[in-house]
Design a protein with these regions (language model features):
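Alpha-helix N-cap and loop-to-helix initiation/capping positions
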Residues: 17-24, 48-59, 87-95, 124-138, ...
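Boundary/entry segment of secreted carbohydrate-active catalytic domains
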Residues: 1-21
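Active-site acidic/histidine proton-transfer and metal-coordination neighborhood
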Residues: 23-24, 28, 63-66, 82-189, ...
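Glycine-rich, proline-tolerant flexible connector loops at the mouths of alpha/beta enzymes
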Residues: 38-64, 115-121
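Acidic/histidine-rich catalytic cores of soluble enzymes
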Residues: 37, 141-248, 253, 305
Length: 306
């Protein structure tokens, strides 16, 4: 299937001199002829609170379509909740359910999750990592079943700054949640996070676990387990928010002529490639170049499915 290109709207919320409104972003992305936008439901961008009624959500859905765009997914704001350090994830799940309804009303088919708490949580709170792992599995089991009721895939974005950031943990988490009957659960393969987790081993607690083949070897290990893709470069560093620096394409260390063919062979069911400029200062200034970079790769590898 031919790939469609979107960009995460959170790029224009976080770490910017001034937050760019969602409506202005839609105009800009339409002018750049992107295929879609991935909704970062944060700040002044659309949230269940800013669009509380079905009518307001219908208007938002139409607004996006009127700009020639589609939603590639949604990233909900769940960072005020806990997942690993609590026995009862009810507050997290209640908020997640609200976002499921919001996503369904907007016609969105995929919702993002992360582990919410840092990898240091186990030592800090004296939690057995296995207990924390099991808590996440049980919570995401419920989340996946709620999401399925709303026609949603659940995509876990593993990151160095969140718990379960070792390559073996990433594979094990996908398998454990799917083993509970959740075929709608999968990994979000973010190229910079994959590099930082698999090649650099950033922020890993205890003994560091890396792969000789870095992000591409992790991609191979996750074959059949990935349901969404975020693409951006990496210079091997963390930013001030303790997550991977999302370098614009061509300014980091990743060779996308190696990554793209492997991604196309990885059996990923999604036809979206989402550009992720999270926390990059003045993100709008590099948006057009990011689109052109991916567009050239799409054209170059069209014969094998790009």
């Amino acid at each position: 299937m031919a790939k469609k290109i979107s960009i995460g709207s959170w790029a224009y919320v976080f770490n910017q001199k001034e937050e760019i409104s969602f409506h202005k972003i839609l105009h800009g992305l339409e002018d750049l002829k992107l295929d879609g936008v991935e909704l970062g439901s944060f700040g002044k961008h659309p949230t269940p609170r800013s669009h509380p009624t079905k009518a307001s959500r219908d208007r938002l859905k139409k607004e996006v379509a009127d700009h020639g765009l589609a939603f590639s997914g949604i990233a909900p704001d769940l960072w005020s909740f806990k997942l690993v350090s609590v026995e009862d994830p009810a507050p997290y799940l209640a908020a997640f359910l609200g976002y499921c309804t919001f996503a369904q009303d907007l016609g969105i088919k995929l919702i993002r999750v992360d582990a919410v708490e840092p990898p240091s949580i186990f030592e800090k709170e004296k939690i057995d990592p296995k207990v924390g792992f099991d808590r996440a599995v049980k919570a995401w089991d419920v989340a996946c079943k709620m999401a399925a009721d709303h026609g949603l895939e659940v995509s876990w974005e593993f990151e160095p700054g969140f718990a379960f950031n070792k390559p073996s943990e990433i594979v094990s988490m996908i398998d454990a949640v799917r083993a509970m009957g959740n075929s709608n659960f999968g990994a979000m393969y973010d190229s910079c996070h994959a590099h930082m987790c698999a090649k650099i081993g950033a922020l890993q607690p205890g003994e560091k676990e890396t792969l000789a083949g870095g992000g591409i070897e992790l991609l191979h290990n996750l074959k059949g387990r990935i349901n969404h893709v975020h693409l951006i470069d990496s210079d091997g560093s963390l930013n001030e928010h303790s997550t991977s620096t999302h370098n614009p394409f061509g300014t980091g260390h990743l060779n996308f002529d190696e990554y793209i063919p492997e991604l196309l062979k990885a059996g990923i069911p999604s036809d979206w490639w989402c550009i992720d400029l999270c926390f990059w200062p003045d993100a709008w200034d590099v948006t057009a170049d990011s689109m052109k970079f991916l567009g050239k790769l799409k054209e170059k590898y069209a014969s094998i499915g790009a």
